[in-house]
Design a protein with these regions (language model features):
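Solvent-exposed beta-strand/loop surfaces, strongest in extracytoplasmic domains of secreted
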Residues: 1-211
Length: 211
């Protein structure tokens, strides 16, 4: 027999070769005409990419590095750049000659992340003295990001606290000492920093202050 038709291929797909019996031969079904035989090149298998390394919020747009990403084998889409800490969805679609390792050929979504940066917290004062003449004082809080500010007193009968924005107001209640602890919760882009404290001493002519 003689071989003809498409006998060589490069891309994945289906091809058709032909076989024709020579003059003294015929097919087992008694025919002598060329027969078509389909042959196939399967798609090559590739693994879905994953984020390589880690990203941390820095206030600027960032894009991840990818492990297993080959521009000749797949296309990248979806969300490929982000600024805020959080999770983002990129997409990868295999080219015409490739399939995923699970055999599928559709678009895959791959999650990548930007981590929160280390938080920071500072107070404009670490100690204060309150008297009958000066019954209140304030602490100005400086923090990175938008984490909620809270403050507590370990002796609310001596000094109470309230928070408004980034200002902590301390009010004298009675003679004694107290420690004010200021905390900042994790925010959108920053982790919670370590707490800071301010020591308070209340001096009064009597043990109790009438407000």
């Amino acid at each position: 027999m003689t071989l003809g038709g498409v006998t060589t291929g490069t891309d994945a797909g289906t091809y058709t070769a032909t076989f024709t019996p020579k003059k003294k031969y015929q097919w087992s079904d008694g025919t002598k005409t060329a027969k078509q035989v389909t042959w196939k090149i399967d798609r090559a298998s590739v693994a879905a990419p994953t984020q390589s390394g880690s990203l941390t919020f820095n206030g600027s747009p960032q894009s991840p590095s990818w492990s297993g990403y080959d521009t000749g084998k797949m296309t990248l889409g979806g969300t490929t750049t982000g600024t805020n800490a959080g999770s983002y969805n990129a997409t990868f679609t295999p080219g015409a000659n490739y399939k995923w390792s699970d055999g599928s050929t559709g678009t895959k979504t791959v999650v990548w992340r930007i981590g929160k940066a280390a938080g920071s917290l500072s107070l404009n004062k670490t100690s204060m003295k309150l008297t009958a003449a000066k019954k209140t004082d304030t602490i100005t809080v400086t923090r990175a990001g938008d984490g909620v500010i809270t403050a507590t007193s370990n002796a609310s009968g001596v000094a109470s606290v309230s928070v408004s924005g980034n200002t902590v107001t301390v009010t004298a209640k009675a003679k004694g000492k107290a420690t004010i602890t200021v905390s900042v919760a994790a925010g959108t882009n920053y982790n919670a920093p370590a707490n800071k404290t301010c020591s308070v001493e209340v001096t009064m002519p009597t043990n109790n202050l009438v407000l």
